[in-house]
């Protein structure tokens, strides 16, 4: 998954099973303009890390320093840079209507600013043209956690307000070069998780954390303030890009620009007032952290009160910039959690302590042998509730499910659990639509197996299996690919046939 299993409380969650989601549906039950697709991201899919002018990203550095779980890297990954034509053909054969992928800033503008790499430009033009030839909508993420290392070295990347101008200039290149064929743009992937994992717990690049808050060895960073600084700069960056697009491109190109959020639905562990408040506080610290400023112009009151002077403030000019700077909301949603009250500790706190909740995925902790840390259970109802909550809390925006899928340590082609998962969550989306939520698309994570940011090559999420031991990186369809294809092609009740 993107950064997704990192949600809020990395590696400490257990897993639950809650049923839900419409059953007996077909493709025709969804609105005519609704799109179904699948997703990847640049560092996780492309490979070709040192080819054709690409410069390192913070993920290259993080992985090569051995900080990932399996010590693997995305140097080759699924080798999408060389295999995209075959993959797009496979997408068309599967019946995909859209494909969400990210652009590598370091491949397009290797120094982070300045000269455009013509080989990078050629590659992305080729991908977009290949999709158009096959009748597949491109949905582009401008940055999927892979900041150019050059900017990290120069001014600490997201910790500096200088990132706003550099990112906006990069986005300008993308809109100018690709916007005649791309109508759906997402600025940032999971800023709520990028700030937490990259600058508090340290499990995501660039791996900043400070003791005792990190979940890894902490050598650089300050967990008490850096998550808030980086999220603040991400919000300002997103808003600046939206303003650029609206003023310079939207009237001509007719596209839309949104932001992506990691979504985890929080149930109260009990019906106590304290747990009900904890579940709401979790939502405010997760969804509200990013969306409240972009809709209402400021952070949620509970964050301002709890974090106090450690939370940056917006100037009046910045408030005017950020308020209303969303055309759509993209969410990455994988599972739900039970949340209960945890007293707010005195003294030094990080984001997790500021939130003052405990979270788990089972109401009672199961024996450890009954779950795998790379897997999680099905709760389609949680996705439905999340969508309905976001609509009620932040407005009737269009929504796209930009990632949803099931990772597993099982590398088999026969993956009925993934079929059940995807089928259930698509049903949850349909339930939300029937309840009035303007959901316009659903993307499975991932189209093919990729390098997972938390699990490396230990977890597989692809509809299509990639043999990472074979230099040719061959693809083979899993049962889930066959089910999804049958569904997209209108079969009323796709038969689950094990792949040959």
Curated annotation (Swiss-Prot):
The UniProt entry's GO biological process terms, in alphabetical order, are: carbohydrate metabolic process
Q: Which cysteines are joined by disulfide bonds?
A: 209-218
User: Record keywords: Transcription regulation included?
Assistant: no
What reactions does this protein catalyze?
Answer: Hydrolysis of terminal, non-reducing beta-D-glucosyl residues with release of beta-D-glucose
| Keyword terms | Disulfide bond, Glycoprotein, Glycosidase, Hydrolase, Signal
EC number per UniProt: 3.2.1.21
Glycosylated residues, chain numbering? 222, 410
* Any GO MF annotation of the entry: beta-glucosidase activity
List residues binding a beta-D-glucoside. 44, 144, 334, 403, 445
Q: Which residues form a coiled coil?
A: none
Domain of life, per UniProt, equals Eukaryota
Q: Where is the signal peptide?
A: 1-24
Annotated active site: 190, 403
Stored PANTHER family? BETA-GLUCOSIDASE 2, GLYCOSYL HYDROLASE
Protein family membership: Belongs to the glycosyl hydrolase 1 family.
Protein name, please? Beta-glucosidase 2
Native source organism of the sequence: Oryza sativa subsp. japonica
Q: Which gene encodes it?
A: BGLU2
């Amino acid at each position: 998954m993107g950064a997704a299993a990192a949600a809020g409380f990395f590696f400490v969650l257990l897993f639950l099973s809650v049923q839900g989601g419409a059953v007996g549906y077909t493709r025709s039950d969804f609105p005519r303009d609704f799109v179904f697709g699948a997703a990847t991201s640049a560092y996780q899919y492309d490979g070709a890390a040192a080819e054709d002018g690409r410069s390192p990203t913070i993920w290259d550095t993080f992985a090569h320093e051995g900080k990932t779980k399996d010590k693997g890297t995305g140097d080759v990954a699924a080798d999408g840079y060389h295999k995209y034509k075959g993959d797009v053909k496979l997408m068309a054969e599967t019946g995909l209507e859209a494909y969400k992928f990210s652009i590598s800033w370091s491949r397009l503008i290797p120094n982070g600013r300045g000269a455009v790499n013509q080989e990078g430009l050629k590659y992305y033009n080729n991908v977009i043209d290949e999709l158009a030839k096959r009748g597949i909508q491109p949905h582009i993420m401008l940055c999927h956690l892979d900041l150019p290392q050059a900017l990290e070295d120069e001014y600490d990347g997201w910790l500096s307000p200088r990132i706003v101008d550099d990112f906006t200039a990069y986005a300008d290149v993308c809109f100018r070069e690709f916007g005649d064929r791309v109508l759906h743009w997402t600025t940032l992937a999971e800023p709520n998780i990028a700030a937490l994992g990259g600058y508090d717990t340290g499990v995501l690049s660039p791996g900043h954390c400070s003791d005792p808050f990190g979940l890894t060895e902490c050598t650089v960073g300050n967990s008490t303030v850096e998550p808030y600084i980086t999220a603040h700069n991400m919000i300002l960056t997103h808003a600046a890009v939206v303003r650029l697009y609206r003023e310079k491109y939207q009237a001509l190109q007719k596209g839309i620009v949104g932001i992506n959020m990691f979504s985890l639905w929080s149930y109260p562990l009990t019906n106590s007032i304290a747990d009900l408040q904890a579940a709401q506080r979790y939502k405010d610290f997760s969804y509200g952290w990013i969306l409240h400023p972009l809709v209402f112009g400021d952070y949620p009151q509970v964050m301002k009160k709890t974090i106090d002077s450690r939370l940056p403030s917006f100037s009046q000019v910045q408030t005017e910039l950020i308020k209303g700077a969303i055309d759509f909301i993209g969410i990455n949603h994988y599972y739900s959690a039970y949340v209960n009250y945890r007293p707010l500790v005195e003294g030094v706190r990080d984001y997790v302590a500021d939130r003052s909740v405990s979270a788990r995925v089972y109401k009672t902790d199961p024996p450890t042998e009954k779950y795998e840390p790379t897997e999680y259970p099905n709760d389609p109802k949680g996705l439905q509730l999340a969508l309905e909550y976001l609509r009620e809390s932040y407005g009737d925006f269009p929504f796209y499910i930009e990632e949803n899928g099931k990772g597993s340590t099982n590398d088999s082609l026969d993956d009925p659990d993934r079929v059940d998962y995807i089928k259930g969550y698509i049903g949850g989306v349909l339930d939300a639509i029937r309840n009035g939520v303007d959901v316009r698309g659903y993307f499975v994570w991932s189209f093919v197996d990729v390098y997972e940011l938390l699990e490396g090559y230990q977890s597989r999420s692809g509809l299509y299996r990639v043999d990472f031991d074979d230099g040719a990186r061959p693809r083979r369809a899993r049962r889930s690919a066959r089910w999804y294809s049958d569904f997209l092609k209108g079969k009323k009740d796709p038969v689950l046939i094990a792949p040959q």
